Amino acid sequence: MSIALQTAGIHHLALRVTDLARAHVFYGRTLDFPIVLETRDSFLALAGHTVLVIRRVQPETTAGDRFDASRVGLDHAALACGSETELERTAAALDAAKVPSTSLRFDPVLKRRYVAFTDPDGIAWEFYMAPELELAVADD
């Protein structure tokens, strides 16, 4: 039996980080995502229409633990990019800010360009060409 889940997309993405202050600088200043709520152990940032919930690691987290895309679970998160100009500007800005990233790449399966980068905990992100999604958001 099919559940036939109907959704407009991801509401929020929750990430655990080892250093909340460092993550606040990365997401709030480096990526310039608006911080909309802060608590002692977390903050919420807006990535377009998606809420990022950034939380401290749990006390039982193994010391030195880092994100690993090869484990079962999240491989990476991709943010939609609406124009080639913005993609190129972002790739250059990541490089200038010394954020670990790839150069602009081409996905041969979906035939789209993107740039991949990591946050200070090694959490993998992509900024991925999807102009049709940007147009849909602009029409909301």
Tell where the protein language model's regions lie, with residue ranges.
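Short beta-strand/turn micro-motifs at beta-sheet edges
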Residues: 1-3, 62-67
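A short, polar/proline- and glycine-enriched secondary-structure boundary/capping micro-motif
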Residues: 34, 56, 63-66, 136-139
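Short, charged/polar, Gly/Pro-enriched secondary-structure boundary elements
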Residues: 50-54, 60-62, 121-125
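Alpha-helical elements of the RecA-like P-loop NTPase motor core of helicases
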Residues: 24-25, 88, 125
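Core segments of cupin and vicinal oxygen chelate
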Residues: 16-58
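N-terminal beta-strand motif that seeds the catalytic metal site of vicinal oxygen chelate
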Residues: 1-21, 74-79, 131-140
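Vicinal oxygen chelate
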Residues: 2-6, 9-18, 65-140
